[in-house]
């Protein structure tokens, strides 16, 4: 598990840089395409558990390792392309510094971190505990709950795929604002509705929340130009860390208070999206003095 974690920590920042290099200027679209691969893999997990592992046992997981071998072959080709790009003579590029004061940049990063806290803690409450919530509240079996989790994770993948290009078109700040604060009515309603409505609401929230992350990553890269790897590593590290810590804390609270009470508490997290008001429009701030 430690080796998998180390591999992931190396892979994601550098791959985010590769995606930006290959974007042709459509940075949000490239970031979405890069991220959606992981989301589709996460979505396939519950489906594989329901259709493969539960009927045939844990040994059937070995067949899934063939996909990892295929990914290694593909990454070999990507690595060759990346090396070739570095060997090319660098062209003169326009200065892309946003000219924002250092303190302003730090405050903006802190706002983004707070928004990521809201997003990933709430996502952890759904992705890690939706199965138990549905089984406890509605009495459905494990296999049916796995399918409902798949619907949520598929919506997350779809939101990731569309969030980047939408940000390219209408602005990343707008996507971040709407995708986090805009889900508040749905999260507040979730603990009080029936099974079908619960599934529908989790799909809507998954789609909207996921659309924020590609926009956040590219926004951060544009906030501090020339530090693509640093920003990518920071954001992916925070995302994975918050997801893991959030899942552990939510589990402890669920043991103390019950899963339904925890879902009611988590339903207020998207209100942190109000902080998106303090995110600057970078193109409007481009020529501010240091």
Where are these regions (language model features)?
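Cytoplasmic helix-loop-helix junction between adjacent transmembrane helices
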Residues: 1-37
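Helix-loop-helix hairpin linking two adjacent transmembrane segments in secondary transporters
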Residues: 34-83
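Small-residue (Gly/Pro/Ala) motifs that create kinks and tight helix-helix packing interfaces
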Residues: 41-53, 131, 246-254
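Flexible cytoplasmic inter-helical loops of multi-pass small-molecule transporters
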Residues: 77-101, 286-290
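Extracytoplasmic gate region of multi-pass secondary transporters
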Residues: 107-153, 157
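Helix-to-loop junctions at the C-terminal end of transmembrane segments
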Residues: 160-171, 254-255
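Structural signature of the two symmetry-related core transmembrane helices
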Residues: 174-188
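A late C-terminal transmembrane helix in Major Facilitator Superfamily
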Residues: 225-257
């Amino acid at each position: 598990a430690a080796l998998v974690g180390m591999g992931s920590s190396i892979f994601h920042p550098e791959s985010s840089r590769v995606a930006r290099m290959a974007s042709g200027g459509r940075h949000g679209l490239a970031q979405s395409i890069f991220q959606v691969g992981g989301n589709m893999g996460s979505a396939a997990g519950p489906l594989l558990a329901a259709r493969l592992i539960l009927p045939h046992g844990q040994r059937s997981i070995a067949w899934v390792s063939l996909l990892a071998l295929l990914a290694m072959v593909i990454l070999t080709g990507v690595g060759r392309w990346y090396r070739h790009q570095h060997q090319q003579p660098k062209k003169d590029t326009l200065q892309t510094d946003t000219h924002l004061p250092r303190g302003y940049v730090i405050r903006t990063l802190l706002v983004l971190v707070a928004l990521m806290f809201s997003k990933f803690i709430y996502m952890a409450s759904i992705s890690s505990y939706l199965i138990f919530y549905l089984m406890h509240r509605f009495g459905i079996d494990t296999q049916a709950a796995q399918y409902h989790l798949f619907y949520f994770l598929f919506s997350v993948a779809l939101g990731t795929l569309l969030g980047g290009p939408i940000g390219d078109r209408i602005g990343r700040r707008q996507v971040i604002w709407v995708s986090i604060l805009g889900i508040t009515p749905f999260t507040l309603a979730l603990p009080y509705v029936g099974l079908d409505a619960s599934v529908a609401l989790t799909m809507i929230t998954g789609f909207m929340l996921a659309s924020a992350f590609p926009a956040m990553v590219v926004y951060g890269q544009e906030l501090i130009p020339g530090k693509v790897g640093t920003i990518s590593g920071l954001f992916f590290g925070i995302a994975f860390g918050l997801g893991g810590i959030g899942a552990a804390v939510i589990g402890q609270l669920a043991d103390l208070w019950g899963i339904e009470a925890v879902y009611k508490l988590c339903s207020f997290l998207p209100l942190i999206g109000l902080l998106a008001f303090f995110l600057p429009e970078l193109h409007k701030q481009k020529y501010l003095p240091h």
